Amino acid sequence: MAAYFDTSVLIPLFFNEAGTAAARLEIAREPSAWVSHWTLAEFSSATAFKLRGGQVTEETTTTAKSLFAQCVASRLTVVDVLREDFVNAAGLCASTPAPGLRTPDALHLAIAQRFGIVMVTFDQALASACGLHGVACRSSD
């Protein structure tokens, strides 16, 4: 069975931070790890944010982006984001009670839902929404 990894798991996989050990365990246990083209854009945004905020150096960012590109090419299945995913994400945002679901997370959820695969996330709001919307989820506290 495949699992869809959101960006909250991928960032600590490639940057040394609090969730790094858990991210390594999650990716190691999953023989079929999926992401979307949305995830690729979000990863790029997160790395740029870390660099602009002075959280990491240019060298660290370059290394992380290179390792991520290698992982995408050799290990991850990258799926397209469809118009129906955006429509479904809008519905998920509207139907998820407080604290709600942010649009980027709703899009990840819609993609996992479309494929009927497990969501792997470290985002607790997204993990809660998975349960509400019938998507199996693995998360870390």
Label the model's feature ranges:
Residues 37-40, 69-97:
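Acidic catalytic patch
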Residues 30-33, 77, 113-119:
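Short active-site oxyanion
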Residues 2, 85, 109, 113-141:
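Acidic, PIN/NYN-like endoribonuclease modules and their adjacent C-terminal/linker elements
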Residues 1-41, 50-66, 132, 138:
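Short, well-structured N-terminal submotif of metal-dependent ribonuclease cores
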Residues 45-52, 114:
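Short glycine/serine- and small hydrophobic-enriched flexible loop segments
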Residues 35, 80, 103, 120-121:
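Short beta-strand scaffold positions
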Residues 7, 83, 104-106, 123:
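Conserved glycosyltransferase catalytic-site signature
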